[in-house]
Amino acid sequence: MDIRAAEISAILKDQIKNFGQEAEVSEVGQVLSVGDGIARVYGLDNIQAGEMVEFENGTRGMALNLETDNVGIVIFGADREIKEGQTVKRTRAIVDAPVGKGLLGRVVDALGNPIDGKGPIQATERKRVDVKAPGIIPRKSVNEPMATGLKSIDALIPVGRGQRELIIGDRQTGKTAIALDTILNQKPLNVAGAPEGQKLYCVYVAIGQKRSTVAQFVKVLEEQGALEYSIIVAATASDPAPMQYIAPFTGCTMGEYFRDNGMHAVIIYDDLSKQAVAYRQMSLLLRRPPGREAYPGDVFYLHSRLLERAAKLNDDHGNGSLTALPVIETQANDVSAYIPTNVISITDGQIFLETDLFFQGIRPAVNVGLSVSRVGSSAQTKAMKKVAGKIKGELAQYREMAAFAQFGSDLDASTQRLLNRGSRLTELLKQPQFSPLKMEEQVCVIWAGTNGYLDKLPLGKVRAFEDGLLSLLRGKNVEILNTIRESRDLSDDTAAKLRSAVDGYAKTFV
């Protein structure tokens, strides 16, 4: 066989020309210094802000500071294995997380990796964790209630779907307990076969908490059958600051999946004070200039861009909603500190919890005078509006009178009556943990309180009266509850039936 030299050289040239084209080209940099969860990297000239990078040992990081001669990278993991001179690779992807219904019932870390030992996540989609909030046009005003199951909140400080309601108070005042009860209260809505428009999925983000606390929280949800419609995102106290900083954004992205697909979700950030502390730590280590209380200048933007993502969308955009319940821990009831005032100004109201009330046995320890809901009343059902209006006024008068009553002992009959009614209503608003009430049950109980059925009872008997009344309504008089639930109103006819039922019960109650 005759082979010409020209042919050989042509084949060789062709192969040489295409040699190595299938090789992967990746932009790499070099670690200049590393420590305290921060790496300074030389190179990576075309990196984007917020881009994910990968170190030699597989640890991930995020580019936060883009400077003239180096890049400041925060490390999502331990920095012990990372050494000076090692290479760092760009991933060309902004930090993202898995989303979808496959996450329900799972516990994940701040990057969406499972940490509950139940195998890989069944999620088909991934979304960026830090995206722009919906604009003005896709939104609509809050008009559906988001029931917490707690009488003092649903009647006096109502929360609507798509609202942002802050839970604020000192340590050990029951902030997480309110969040937990809210999740448990969604169980009747999330029964199998219920319409998607009714269901409310829950996302709980634990930031900087003890692992034992998170484990206990998950255990309660599992025991009560509430884990199946919940997602837990945990960045515990032992996790690096960057993980605690990114966790709320990851949780928010998971909640947004439901909002954008015409479903409803509630997200609880527990708590944002610890996220601000983690962000302050990162910013100071990146040598960004400190501001008030040594927080960086953009700590307001950190929380506002997160909380603005909670929204009620209009019909053209699927009618979905994401409700946010951020938690803030105060020091000695100081709500005028930097982070509390920031978050109060961003949210649509706050539930203010007080240590003194907690120790007096008023639990949930909600200070009804300082707590407000700026948009929730438009989401209240007609039935609740009718009974709540009266209790609000009576409690406000009671608080005013109680302050004066401390000075004088000889009070006239009307003042005495007012104080008597107020103390009974305060007793009525107490509620043990893990026992949320349905809207129609709350309406009946509060109606009985504001119509004077508790006035002659000793304080210690109020709880027993309430429990007995609820048993009666759930048993013999269940049609009253059904009518209120279906019509969402307390008509004169239903009120008359309720009056005769409560009259009959009050006569037999001893």
Curated annotation (Swiss-Prot):
Protein name as catalogued = ATP synthase subunit alpha
Keywords (alphabetical) are: ATP synthesis, ATP-binding, Cell inner membrane, Cell membrane, CF(1), Hydrogen ion transport, Ion transport, Membrane, Nucleotide-binding, Translocase, Transport
TM ranges are: none
Q: Where in the cell does this protein reside? A: Cell inner membrane
Q: Which GO terms describe its cellular component?
A: plasma membrane; proton-transporting ATP synthase complex
How it assembles, according to the record, is:
F-type ATPases have 2 components, CF(1) - the catalytic core - and CF(0) - the membrane proton channel. CF(1) has five subunits: alpha(3), beta(3), gamma(1), delta(1), epsilon(1). CF(0) has three main subunits: a(1), b(2) and c(9-12). The alpha and beta chains form an alternating ring which encloses part of the gamma chain. CF(1) is attached to CF(0) by a central stalk formed by the gamma and epsilon chains, while a peripheral stalk is formed by the delta and b chains.
Give the reaction(s) catalysed.
ATP + H2O + 4 H(+)(in) = ADP + phosphate + 5 H(+)(out)
Enzyme kind, highest EC tier: translocase
Q: Does the keyword Secreted apply?
A: no
Entry keyword Signal: no
